[in-house]
Swiss-Prot record:
It catalyses: hydrogencarbonate + L-glutamine + 2 ATP + H2O = carbamoyl phosphate + L-glutamate + 2 ADP + phosphate + 2 H(+). The active site is at C247, H331, D333. The lineage of its organism: Bacteria, Bacillati, Bacillota, Bacilli, Lactobacillales. One of its GO terms (biological process) is 'de novo' pyrimidine nucleobase biosynthetic process. NCBIfam families: CPSaseIIsmall (TIGR01368), PRK12838.1 (NF009475). The keyword ATP-binding applies. Small subunit of the glutamine-dependent carbamoyl phosphate synthetase (CPSase). CPSase catalyzes the formation of carbamoyl phosphate from the ammonia moiety of glutamine, carbonate, and phosphate donated by ATP, constituting the first step of 2 biosynthetic pathways, one leading to arginine and/or urea and the other to pyrimidine nucleotides. The small subunit (glutamine amidotransferase) binds and cleaves glutamine to supply the large subunit with the substrate ammonia. This is Carbamoyl phosphate synthase small chain. InterPro entries: Anth_synth/Amidotransfase (IPR050472), CarbamoylP_synth_ssu (IPR006274), CarbamoylP_synth_ssu_N (IPR002474), CarbP_synth_ssu_N_sf (IPR036480), Class_I_gatase-like (IPR029062), CPSase_GATase1 (IPR035686), GATASE (IPR017926). L-glutamine binds at S46, G220, G222, L248, Q251, N289, G291, Y292. GO terms for molecular function: ATP binding; carbamoyl-phosphate synthase (glutamine-hydrolyzing) activity; glutaminase activity. It comes from the Bacteria.
Amino acid sequence: MSKRLLILEDGTIFEGESLGANLDVTGELVFNTGMTGYQESITDQSYNGQILTFTYPIVGNYGVNRDDYESIHPTCKAVVVHEAACRPSNWRMQMSFDEFLKAKNIPGITGVDTRAITKIVREHGTMKASLVQARDEVEHQMSQLQATVLPTNQVETSSTTTAYPSPNTGRKVVVVDFGLKHSILRELSKRECNLTVVPYNTSAQEILEMEPDGVMLTNGPGDPTDVPEAIEMIKEIQGKIPIFGICLGHQLFSLANGAKTYKMKFGHRGFNHAVREIATGRIDFTSQNHGYAVSSENLPEDLMITHVEINDDSVEGVRHKHFPAFSVQFHPDAAPGPHDASYLFDDFMDLMDNFKK
């Protein structure tokens, strides 16, 4: 293996072995605390443009299979691992972790201290980083990193460009794709929903003309304020159709109702985040992947907070007081992670049924 460098914006440099595609890339450095589920995480479009560090000490031990993709074309910039398994084994495995990264043109680095990287990000917040081949021109690479401006509106490159159906016999649901995970479609299909997936910039009029029973606002990457057209669409359809928002969809729904969002210091990325439902006191362990959150300060009168994160008390769910609409910051579809909150899809079914009465 050739040597590769991970250069952080604060000047810290980590040297390790090359993994995956032979590319030099720059992105936002984040970390994920999950112990498994690396395939689902890498193929989650919410990691668009990010260099994903796995805190678990060994990654790739069960290879990659055809069933656990959350999107076919992953858009994360690179992966960072302490150790990439050299002898993976699983009955579903189709290729190794390294083969998968090469097939998807994703570079990586192995043999670095991921605990130290995570500590830096926790203390100083998410930052830019570059993954490059080890050369003698480190100062030049550092100056290039400092000068790089990361792209905005990553939803545009994560969303479908054309509408497509996923037919079934039940409730008609329009799924607005901001970078959706396939597991959301699976959960809705399990409930026999007749789905139409549409691009992120689909207008309210186009959605209303489809006469759906409900609208799903999916997860996706980046800053929700970069998608003003979606915020306007939500303003126009709420009250007319039941709405369920997840992750970025939750943030967009909140913005459409006058709430504010903010960039978190290092975000929530993992599968063990405890969330409390305020009405019942119920605790769910949830899968999360977000760097922005809805502010609890000066929350609009029309919204009520339904869920909070146990560790930092951040907003994890809201419900509209007058319209049939609610949203959560976490992923009730899991994939990977616990299925504690999958009942929320059933709540969405009930919301649609009651609205028709």
